[in-house]
Amino acid sequence: MTLGKEGEPMRRYAVETIVDGTTKYYFIRDCETLEIVLLPSKYLKHKIKSKRSPNTVKRSAFSICYYLEYLEELSMDIPQVCGLDFEKQNEHFVDFLHWLKAGNHTQENKIRTINNGTCNAYLEDVFRFYLFAEAQDSRIGSLKVLSYSYHVAVNAVGVQKKLRYQSFKGYLKAEERDVRPAEQEEIITLLQACTNCRDQLLLLLLAETGFRIGWC
């Protein structure tokens, strides 16, 4: 294992970008071999080609990168995870959520606590990558812990489309937001801090509709 600053272990994988014209592509590099990790990078390119938003692709890139670090710690790879039985596979992904929650995905893990919703969103990105990997090569195998449901949506011209979405029983429980009604003095302080009439008007509208501290 390579040690970095103050003896901390260096991350095995890193998210990098390359710009082609006006399009930014994301890929994942193995920092030990300096090679591009092909399957995840192919998936990220697919998302760009599919016109997914840059922010969505960026988050997917980091989600997968974090997951690859998690696999590195376990000395496992994608096919091995697919080969686990239901119970072990479920445990694997629940442990990944707790690994994220503990801040192990970042070297600045003492700065702030990651919330449950963000952990769940990272895992959702990982599941989408698994579905892509399975579609690319059936020999990789498929996940046993995902259950699938279908929803029929109708577009603007009345054409029905059957949409499939996956669910996982092990997601972290949603946290209650720490909000409370804003006091009058707090609203006045915010109004006085505003530099233009537009922001003052927006604050007044929020105050009328039940402004909560913790929304901002």
Q: How should these model regions be labeled?
A:
Residues 24, 174-178, 189:
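A detector of helix-start/N-cap boundary segments at the beginnings of structured domains
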Residues 33, 99, 162-165:
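Short, compositionally biased low-complexity segments
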Residues 39-55, 64-157, 189:
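N-terminal core-binding DNA-recognition domain of tyrosine recombinases/integrases
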